């Protein structure tokens, strides 16, 4: 399986790091990473990682301005793309087909090739414009996986919450997360 992972500058960089760490533990998954300019800043602000540290978690790292990268073409076969976190600017660009930079172009390619596109939108509160953009994309088959915590699994830390969100993202590709804590029913503890 080949997956594109894109990181935008929206808050939530630890989720992207955790996703890449999870994908490292899943056999036969090749990751292609793209980080926006602001993603690099956000990574260094929100985590203990540098952008370089995050880049080495991926199999291939592409420059966000390289419109000639392999992932900018539909003839380069991938199984889909995850944008985590996804800024509202990026989401709006995807909705309108404005393929600025490699993240927008790769998302456009994934959509036109009818491959799986998963967005982890990061904003609060949501405006009607945000909601309309998300609805329009969802109606086109794009999966919206907002990073919402679950309380049924009794998280003890922020890492537990991140693990749950990453598990739900990986579920979109039918990949088993090494961090999964699955619902076992109300009486199971």
List the model feature ranges, each with a label.
Residues 1-118, 124-189:
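A cross-family phosphate/adenosyl-ligand binding-site feature
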